[in-house]
Every structure is written in C-alpha cells, then in structure tokens.
Amino acid sequence: MNIDNNLLIEQKEQQLILTLNRPEASNSLTPELVEVMIDALTQANSIRLCVIKANGKNFCAGFDLSTIESLSDGDLLHRFVRLETLLQIIHHAPCSVLILTQGHSVGAGADIVAAGGYRVAAPGSTFRMPGWQFGIALGTRRLTRLIGTDAARDLLIDTKVAEAEIALSMGLINEISAQSDWASLILRAQQRAMALPETSLNTLMDLTCLLYTSPSPRDRQKSRMPSSA
C-alpha cells in the first residue's frame, strides 16, 4: 500500500483502491489531493476495478475552501480545471469504477459520485450540489445525463439535500448498503469486472461513455424529486 497523507493507494490483483484520508476536514479536496488522485488513476496499469472511498464520517465535503480568499482568479480557475480533469478521468476510466459513500457528499464530492460507474451509499448518506450558487457548473452535464433534466434542475436550482433513498430513486446512486457489507460488495464488483477479457472491458467502457450522451430513460419518464426532499 502506498500511503500519502491525504490519500491511501492500494493496488492488487488488477484492483485499485483509492481512499480519501482527510477525515478531520470531511475529506475536502485540496489541490494536492486532486493531483495525487489524477496521478494514481492515470499511472495504474491493467486495472479491472477502481474503488473510490473515504475514511471518516463523510465521503467528501467538496473543495477545500480554507485558502480561497488568498487565491487569484487564475488560481481558482486552475483548481476548477484540474478538478474537471479528475472527474473526466473517473468517468472515462477504461475499467469499472465503484464509488462507496457515507455521510455527506457535497459539491465536488457529489460530482465524484456522479462520475462513477456504480455508486453505493451507506444508510443515512446525503448528497448536495450547491455549486450554481457560486456560478460553478462542474459536473452539470454528467448529472443531467445520469438522472434526467427535471431531477437535475431540482437538485441544482434549489440546492436540495438528497437523502440516500431519494438519491436511489433518482438514479444518483445504484444501491444502499451498510459499510459492513462493502468488502463483499467489492469482491462482487471485482468478479463482475473480470467476466470479460481486459481488451473487451476497456472497449465496452469506452463505447458506453460515448453513448452516454443519449437521453436518459429518466428524462423520458420526467422523474422529479419529491418537494419535501
């Protein structure tokens, strides 16, 4: 296991596990953490399954805003560009990407969830995307393609908190699972990722990303979040 102060990196048996490790800051994303994640994802070879999870009570609180007042507009733009690079790498990964969340996933943290291929939340998890309050559009298209136009607008305009059950009904997550069951869930995901030859899996992931621009079934169903959420 390669241990960074902010990220634990474990690679074994064609499996890459990235664990956000800033629990004292709700795993908020510093520029350094974003770069370490980008490096880990781009340098890994022959991976069938990538797991992204976090230590502590919360999955990810989004951007680390502790130094925002000292940043120039150029510095802030660079941070957004690098975060979008990370999200694109996750979304277009040539392997299966499993996201395991607990507690709160906010802003860029929720964007990481939406970029993953299979998204699992522990009971009691919540998701919130307040970026448009600040004019930040990161992840908007991915979210819309994932859950549909109406549900995305409900989340983004009203900056609603989506609890796990609501997120599941919207399609933001695929499954609710207790953290005690995550080890078996990872094993199941690994077995599924090994079902195809590596080149076939890579091609499949690439083609389905290209087709991701097709209208979501949830768009056609005009699904909406309950107003009480």
Predicted region positions:
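Glycine- (often His-adjacent) and acidic-residue-rich active-site loop
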Residues: S46, A54-L86
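Conserved CoA-thioester-binding segment of acyl-CoA-metabolizing enzymes
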Residues: M1-N55
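Crotonase-fold acyl-CoA enzyme core
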Residues: L7, Q88-E198
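Short alpha-helical scaffolding segments that buttress acidic/His motifs in well-ordered protein cores
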Residues: L155-L156, L204-T208
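Hydrophobic/aromatic residues within transmembrane alpha-helices
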Residues: L18, I52, D64, I112-A114, ...
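Catalytic-core regions built around general acid/base machinery
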Residues: A40, R82-A93
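Conserved small/polar residues in nucleotide/adenosyl-binding loops
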Residues: Y212-D219
